[in-house]
Amino acid sequence: NLVSISEALTTMKVLGMDMNVTYEAIKASSGNSFVHETESQVILNGSRDISFTMDLVSKDIGIFNELAERKGLELEIAPMVIDIFKDGEKRYGSRELSPNIIKRLEERADVEVLGSGFPSEMIDDEPEEKGYEVVIKNRKDN
């Protein structure tokens, strides 16, 4: 989601769209996601700080891809995302904040993807709630 939202934001910037309008348009569309509603805000603020780094994204997507390969399933998108983040790590360092993957596109397009009025960090101010067990009826694992 982070890579696709980076492409969407950068494309709209290149097309001359207002980034605040772009954010709201994506939020109201079928392209909306948790990643858009959270990480797009810190991208548009410029801080890009979600306390998650490129090497952690690479690790997670690598594990996912490896699990699929173990079952003989050759994925299409995961290997591309792996390559994109490997390139990001090479350019900016493995401990670079993951939303800065957008810099690859910003540099290519010679733009800065920024909006106004977005927070520099995402703060979870919802009250803590007691967790609960999710029970799946008729579960059939392979």
Language model features: what each stretch is:
Residues 1-108:
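Helical "substrate-binding/catalytic lid" subdomain
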